[in-house]
Amino acid sequence: MTNTRKSHPLIKIVNHSFIDLPAPSNISAWWNFGSLLGVCLGLQILTGLFLAMHYTADTTTAFSSVTHICRDVNYGWLIRYMHANGASMFFIFLYFHIGRGIYYGSYTFMDTWNIGVLLLFAVMATAFMGYVLPWGQMSFWGATVITNLLSAIPYIGPTLVEWIWGGFSVDKATLTRFFAFHFILPFIITAMVMIHLLFLHETGSNNPSGMNSDSDKIPFHPYYTIKDILGILFMMTTLMSLVMFTPDLLGDPDNYTPANPLNTPPHIKPEWYFLFAYAILRSIPNKLGGVLALVFSILILMLFPILHSSKQRSMSFRPLSQCLMWMLVANLLILTWIGGQPVEHPFITIGQLASMTYFFIILILMPSTALMENKLLQW
């Protein structure tokens, strides 16, 4: 008689994905972030569900309902801050996960990579709409500024913005639809994650060497299940420390002021995880140019498989490319810092230089360095 785990139509799928899955024997802790992102998504859906039970998506009561959650609902403050800081953890892991993919050449799995980039867009959209829901000053003005960018689209722009707003400004209709989309998108993301995994399991995982690991595979369970649990333990320790000790560390104080269309905050800025893209947007004086640069700063990830010119897959044995990779990381940190600064000298110039360098490293320096390394290795 065959094992139920291997014969049952449903359990069989789980078995092939998480138990008997052949995995490379040498994958490092950088491969932990996929499972951590899965846990983050589950946590966000769960905490979000409980928040939605008490939240009201109406401009007159939204802010008060969030206050009510924090003050009157049993452990409401805990649920709210786990959800808010959980989003920050989600993005930290997303950026690590993408960075790992770039460093080790995982983008050569084109199907997996492209659905991953689409996932990034979906998560960014979800986070943006979630930030609008508490209806604080930064929620309102963030929504106004970002949705207004669509008016830069030639011909249909202004009509499109009013259509998204559901009126002539960010108001009741906007908040209601943002709540609806914020609720449905995580489930769409979950479906996309399944497709992401489906494509990944077609090829198997990459590994730090970037070489084929078919000759040395080990079962996912117990080796990587236990490793994932350790990662989850670290993640939960960090998240709960953040929630319990400094829950507002990553938030904006302006969002504790109820939304007021008649009073603009001195510095409108998004959450920290969007600051790098915001800096790129602001570095171009033209509205349409800025919007295109903003979209392309993320969309550029889809070009990595095309731009790959090295004869080696991974950067593990390519010191020059490694230097460029860390230059790119430093550049992104500079952009993040600039995104949170006011629009004045010297920040404007630094932002423009960093934005230019970002595209220059990815589009020109990385491919040409890879070609040079091929030459140096006489390939």
Curated annotation (Swiss-Prot):
**Keyword Cell membrane included in the entry's annotation:** no
Enumerate the UniProt keywords alphabetically. Electron transport, Heme, Iron, Membrane, Metal-binding, Mitochondrion, Mitochondrion inner membrane, Respiratory chain, Transmembrane, Transmembrane helix, Transport, Ubiquinone
- The reply on keyword Cytoplasm is no
GO terms (molecular function) for this protein are: metal ion binding; ubiquinol-cytochrome-c reductase activity
**Residue sites binding a ubiquinone per the record:** 201
Cofactor(s) it depends on = heme b
Q: Which family does it belong to?
A: Belongs to the cytochrome b family.
What name appears for this protein in its UniProt entry?
Cytochrome b
Q: Source organism lineage?
A: Eukaryota, Metazoa, Chordata, Craniata, Vertebrata
Gene designation: MT-CYB
